[in-house]
Structure formats: C-alpha cells, structure tokens
C-alpha cells in the first residue's frame, strides 16, 4: 500500500510540473528548429513557414507604386515650393537690374503681326465657302494612240527597208 501511494504521488508531481511549464509531448514534437526546416523555410511559432523576402514580387505587389510615389511626391513638393516663391524671385531680379545702373533695361520684345495667330471661338465656315469650286471647262480633245506630226507625217526615222 505504501508503494501505491509513492507511485501516485510521483505521477501527480510530474503531472503538475508539466502543466506548470505548459509543455507537452505534442508541442515539443511540433516546434521546429533551424536545422529541421528545409531550405526556403524558417521556423515560425509552431511550424516551418516559407521565407518571406522583403521585396519579393509575390509578397509585395505594390512595390512599383511605392517607389514611384517616393519619387514623385518629393518632386511635386519641390515644384510647389518653387511656384510659391517664383513671383518673389522675378521681382527681386527686376529690382537688382534697377539698382545696377550699368546694365540697361531692355524693352520687351514685340513680335511682328505676321507671326501672331488669333484663334476665334466662332464655328468654322461651311465647306462650300472654304473649297473654291473651279468653273467648268470644256472636256479635253480626244487623244489618238499614234503620235502625228504637224502635217500628218509620222515622227521618227523612216527605214529604207520598209
């Protein structure tokens, strides 16, 4: 009877110890190690998972859009700043020109009237006004297949044998 009490106490003690650690036989069998995972897999919490590369196209489909946004947004920001300060820069350039008396102020260039194009918002004229019809003429005279000279003689060399 004493032996039964010892075996029961040992079983109870080891059972409580294993439950306190939270480790069972099934969990130790499912945990993986770096050596146990095949190539291309890494050890996750309880199993081997495929490796994820940071810029793998299968994992990140929007890589191109992210790179494009990282390039375009700073350029747009710089352009907005330049357009914000651009009128001030042109006024400063004119002020510098006026302060410096050695450089003459150039008058604005005037384009000749021939090079100025004016667009109107009116609809275009009808086709009959744009295309000028030629007056009807007489039909051309009929043509002959044989060329003739001024007096009805044949042109070219005359062969003595014919």
From Swiss-Prot:
Region (Disordered): 134-162
Annotated signal peptide: 1-22
Disulfide links within the chain: none
Membrane-spanning segments: 64-84
Cellular location(s): Membrane
Extracellular side: 23-63
Source species, domain of life: Eukaryota
Key words, A-Z: Membrane, Signal, Transmembrane, Transmembrane helix
Membrane association type: Single-pass type I membrane protein
Regions of this protein lying in the Cytoplasmic compartment: 85-162
GO cellular component terms given for this protein: membrane
Name this polypeptide is given: Transmembrane protein 92
Gene responsible for this protein: Tmem92
């Amino acid at each position: 009877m004493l032996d039964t009490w010892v075996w029961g106490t040992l079983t109870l003690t080891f059972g409580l110890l294993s439950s306190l650690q939270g480790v069972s036989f099934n969990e130790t069998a499912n945990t993986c190690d770096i050596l146990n995972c095949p190539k291309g897999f890494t050890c996750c919490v309880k199993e081997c998972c495929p490796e994820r590369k940071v810029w793998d196209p299968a994992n990140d489909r929007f890589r191109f859009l992210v790179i494009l946004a990282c390039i375009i947004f700073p350029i747009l920001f710089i352009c907005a700043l330049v357009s914000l300060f651009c009128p001030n820069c042109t006024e400063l350039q004119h002020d510098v020109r006026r302060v410096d008396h050695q450089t003459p102020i150039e008058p604005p260039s005037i384009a000749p009237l021939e090079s100025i194009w004016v667009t109107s918002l009116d609809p275009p004229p009808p086709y009959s006004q744009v295309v000028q019809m030629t007056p009807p003429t007489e039909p051309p005279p009929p043509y002959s297949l044989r060329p003739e000279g001024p007096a009805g003689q044949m042109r070219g060399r005359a062969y003595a044998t014919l």
